[in-house]
Amino acid sequence: MSRRCELTGKAVLTGHLVSHSNRKTKRRFLPNLCNVTLLSDTLGRSVRLRISANALRSVEHRGGLDAFLVKAGEQDLSQNARLLKREIEKKLAAAA
C-alpha cells in the first residue's frame, strides 16, 4: 500500500534534518494518512478510503464526499476514487 492520499494525491516528500551545527541528514516527510469510511449520499453506501487528515477536512468543508469528488480534478485522484467519481456522476446525470 503506497503512502499516498487517495483524494488529494499527497505523498511522501524528502528533505534534510538540520542540526544545530547545520549538519544535514536525509529525512522523509510522511503524509498524515487515516483509514476512514465516508458515506456517499448519491450512491447510498459507505466507502472506505485512505486519505490525509487535510483531505478529510476538505471533504467536510465541501459538504460531503459527493460534492468533493464532483469538483475534484481527475489527475490527483487514485484509480479507486476515479471510479467512484464516475459512478456518482452517472447517478446524478440519470437523476437529472
Curated annotation (Swiss-Prot):
Any single Pfam family the record assigns to this protein: Ribosomal_L28
Family membership noted in the UniProt record: Belongs to the bacterial ribosomal protein bL28 family.
Gene: rpmB
GO biological process: translation
Alphabetized InterPro entries for the sequence: Ribosomal_bL28, Ribosomal_bL28/bL31-like_sf, Ribosomal_bL28_bact-type, Ribosomal_bL28_sf
Entry keywords, A to Z: Ribonucleoprotein, Ribosomal protein
Name of the protein in its database record: Large ribosomal subunit protein bL28
Transmembrane segments: none
Gene Ontology terms, MF aspect: structural constituent of ribosome
